[in-house]
């Protein structure tokens, strides 16, 4: 990760040294990009979370976070989330989708995530680290009171043992009800 930020710093230095001597090779960063750069450089992730940049080092605004819970119903699963960050960040929350199809009360089958800090509770003082910890918390403490997947929420609320069985079955690549899930363990 440090290498990524050294590349960005070198590009900034080259841009400054070219000042007045031809076109700059680096575009000017928006306030959102600068804030995101700061947030990423200050990330303090648990060992069970990893960040990657599938579009390369020059696209910090789109990245993926992989969460591998080390406790709870989702123990040992691998869940990938895509983050799209607009230039309006931090005044606008990042767009987060779960790329891994998962049986979860707070994540629907299309990957939409129900996390209050990504909606009505977003504030500019929050950062990417806060969002990642929020996602991690969804796997250690799924919330049946604010669901996107109402069926999973009802099972969690009414029969936690059946919910645990369904989660394991889904994570092993099985079927829950009429829905098939890819293996994610």
From Swiss-Prot:
One of its GO terms (biological process) is protein neddylation. GO terms for molecular function: ATP binding; transferase activity. Residues 16-28 have a biased composition (Polar residues). The active site is at residue 114. SUPFAM superfamilies: UBC-like (SSF54495). Gene3D superfamilies: Ubiquitin Conjugating Enzyme (3.10.110.10). Keywords: ATP-binding, Nucleotide-binding, Transferase, Ubl conjugation pathway. It is an enzyme of class 2 (transferase). Coiled coil: none annotated. InterPro entries: UBQ-conjugat_E2_core, UBQ-conjugating_AS, UBQ-conjugating_enzyme/RWD. This is Probable NEDD8-conjugating enzyme Ubc12-like. Accepts the ubiquitin-like protein NEDD8/RUB1 from the ECR1-AXR1 E1 complex and catalyzes its covalent attachment to other proteins. Its EC number is 2.3.2.-. Residues 8-29 are annotated as: Disordered.
């Amino acid at each position: 990760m440090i290498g990524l930020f050294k590349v960005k710093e070198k590009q900034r230095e080259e841009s400054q040294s070219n000042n007045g001597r031809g076109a700059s090779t680096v575009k000017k960063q928006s306030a959102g990009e600068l804030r995101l750069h700061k947030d990423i450089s200050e990330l303090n992730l648990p060992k069970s979370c990893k960040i990657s940049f599938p579009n390369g080092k020059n696209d910090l605004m789109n990245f993926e976070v992989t969460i591998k819970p080390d406790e709870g119903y989702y123990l040992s699963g691998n869940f990938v989330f895509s983050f799209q960050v607009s230039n309006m960040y931090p005044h606008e929350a990042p767009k987060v989708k779960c790329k891994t199809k998962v049986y979860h009360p707070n994540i629907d089958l299309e990957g939409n995530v129900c996390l209050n800090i990504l909606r009505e509770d977003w504030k500019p003082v929050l950062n990417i680290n806060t969002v990642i910890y929020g996602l991690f918390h969804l796997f250690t403490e799924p919330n049946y009171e604010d669901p996107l997947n109402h069926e999973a929420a009802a099972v969690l609320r009414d029969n936690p043992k059946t919910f645990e069985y369904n989660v394991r079955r889904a994570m092993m690549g099985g079927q829950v009800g009429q829905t098939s899930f890819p293996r994610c363990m």
